[in-house]
């Protein structure tokens, strides 16, 4: 039954007993009342229970083929990279769920290094993996890191981003994925150890070693530098999957030089280095090539899985524009649909956009900038017009910088006509 305050004859919350004057809202039901504070408490309890149910059991881990199928929905091409990532991720979480030890055999963690040109899908692959597995995910930029005691970010700040992504749930963060981009930028300046201190190169590699391998790290909850009088969050990195990626510009020449020494001999087929594309060359990658590039042996040793990504050609870029679940063309179609306008990209226009991205050497990452340039004026004008039914993008919009064609309707005569935006 509804509760009343006997003294003031006021309605009261049936759960906590507070009067309507003591709370912001009082929601009435059949013979019962509940205040906004109790509703909020109920939501928190339900959310906690749902979060507890998110832990993956061995049967819940997607199989490699299932992981690959989901990656296919978001990432075009890169078939070999997807296979390698699917297997590595499946084995990683299988190892966690089985307790890292089976019949006295200790299963070691397999962190991943991804090599591929700018805009080839490294970050997208890593973030999609985290989405598939429903685990916290954090991205860090290796170029902002320095070793402890110097201006820049400590490596522990990477772990803070993961904790924040897990809403400060440490147990959840300890099963997350961290992607460190631009890892090639912290290569030391030469293959040989230097007597001068390299605080943003070799020093960072040294600082990353422990968290890559597995340690209990002390993470400052507010970020920034550590100092003795602050409290720390203790985070065990043993089960965190680290994926590092970079373009590694110039590593193809290191590989070609190594291969070139071995093709000289009786009956050997001599192939000019220039005849091999970078994708073919990267397939010959060995850990020794990463050492030659400037990564230290201990760092390379903690990245046993090497995944190579190819540069995207015109056909792949066109497919990226139209096929994935979150394809750019689909996004802009939906944006214009909200203004009551249909959007059409001609096939030649899609090819011209892909060619422009290749010319700019930006890969898939540069596609959005090109499409945004094309659509900016249209998206500025359309909300103020109610006579446009369709927008058509032709190749001349990209090649000759013309405006997209707008199909308008003369409401008095109900006739359609085309005009430039």
From Swiss-Prot:
PROSITE patterns: CLPX_ZB. InterPro entries: AAA+_ATPase, ATP-dep_Clp_protease_ClpX, ATPase_AAA_core, Clp_ATPase_C, Clp_protease_ATP-bd_su_ClpX, ClpX_bact, P-loop_NTPase, Znf_CppX_C4. ATP binds at residues 117-124. Zn(2+) binds at residues 13, 16, 35, 38. Pfam families: AAA_2, ClpB_D2-small, zf-C4_ClpX. Gene3D superfamilies: 1.10.8.60, ClpX chaperone, C4-type zinc finger domain, P-loop containing nucleotide triphosphate hydrolases. One of its GO terms (biological process) is cell division. SUPFAM superfamilies: Glucocorticoid receptor-like (DNA-binding domain), P-loop containing nucleoside triphosphate hydrolases. Residues 1-54 form the ClpX-type ZB domain. GO terms for cellular component: HslUV protease complex. Keywords: ATP-binding, Chaperone, Metal-binding, Nucleotide-binding, Zinc. GO terms for molecular function: ATP binding; ATP hydrolysis activity; ATP-dependent protein folding chaperone; protein dimerization activity; unfolded protein binding; zinc ion binding. ATP-dependent specificity component of the Clp protease. It directs the protease to specific substrates. Can perform chaperone functions in the absence of ClpP. Belongs to the ClpX chaperone family. Component of the ClpX-ClpP complex. Forms a hexameric ring that, in the presence of ATP, binds to fourteen ClpP subunits assembled into a disk-like structure with a central cavity, resembling the structure of eukaryotic proteasomes. This is ATP-dependent Clp protease ATP-binding subunit ClpX. It comes from Desulfitobacterium hafniense (strain Y51). The gene is clpX.
């Amino acid at each position: 039954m509804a509760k009343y305050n006997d003294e003031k004859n006021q309605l009261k919350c049936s759960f906590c007993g507070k009067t309507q004057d003591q709370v912001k809202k009082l929601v009435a039901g059949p013979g019962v009342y509940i205040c906004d504070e109790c509703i909020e408490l109920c939501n928190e309890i339900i959310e906690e229970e749902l979060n507890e149910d998110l832990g993956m059991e061995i049967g819940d881990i997607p199989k490699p083929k299932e992981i690959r199928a989901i990656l296919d929905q978001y990432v075009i091409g890169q078939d070999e990279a997807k296979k390698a990532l699917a297997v590595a991720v499946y084995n990683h979480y299988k190892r966690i769920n089985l307790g890292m030890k089976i019949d006295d055999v200790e299963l070691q963690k397999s962190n991943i290094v991804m090599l591929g040109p700018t805009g080839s899908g490294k970050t997208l692959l890593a973030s999609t993996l985290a989405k598939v597995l429903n685990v916290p995910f954090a991205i860090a930029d290796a170029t902002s890191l320095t070793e402890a005691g110097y201006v820049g970010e400590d490596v522990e700040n990477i772990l803070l981003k993961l904790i924040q992504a897990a809403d400060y749930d440490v147990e959840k963060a300890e099963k997350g994925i961290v992607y460190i981009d631009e890892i090639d930028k912290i290569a030391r300046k030469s293959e040989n150890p230097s007597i001068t201190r390299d605080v943003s190169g070799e020093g960072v590699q040294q600082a990353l070693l422990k968290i890559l391998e597995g340690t209990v790290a002390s993470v400052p909850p507010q970020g920034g530098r550590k100092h003795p009088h602050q409290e720390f969050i203790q985070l065990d990195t043993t089960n965190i999957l680290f994926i590092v990626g970079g373009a590694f510009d110039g590593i193809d020449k290191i590989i070609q030089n190594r291969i070139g020494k071995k093709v000289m001999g009786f009956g050997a087929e001599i192939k000019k280095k220039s005849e091999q594309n970078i994708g073919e060359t990267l397939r010959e990658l060995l850990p020794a090539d990463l050492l030659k590039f400037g990564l230290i042996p201990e760092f390379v040793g903690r990245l046993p899985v090497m995944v190579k990504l190819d540069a995207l050609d015109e056909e792949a870029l066109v497919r990226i524009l139209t096929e994935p679940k979150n394809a750019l063309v689909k996004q802009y179609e939906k944006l214009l649909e909200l203004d009551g306008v249909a959007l059409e990209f001609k096939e030649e226009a899609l090819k011209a956009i892909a060619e422009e991205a290749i010319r700019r050497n930006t890969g898939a990452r540069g596609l959005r900038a090109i499409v945004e340039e094309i659509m900016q004026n249209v998206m500025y004008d359309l909300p103020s017009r109610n006579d446009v039914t369709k927008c058509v993008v032709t190749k001349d919009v990209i090649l000759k910088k013309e405006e997209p064609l707008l199909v308008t309707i003369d409401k008095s005569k109900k006739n359609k006509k085309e005009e430039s935006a």
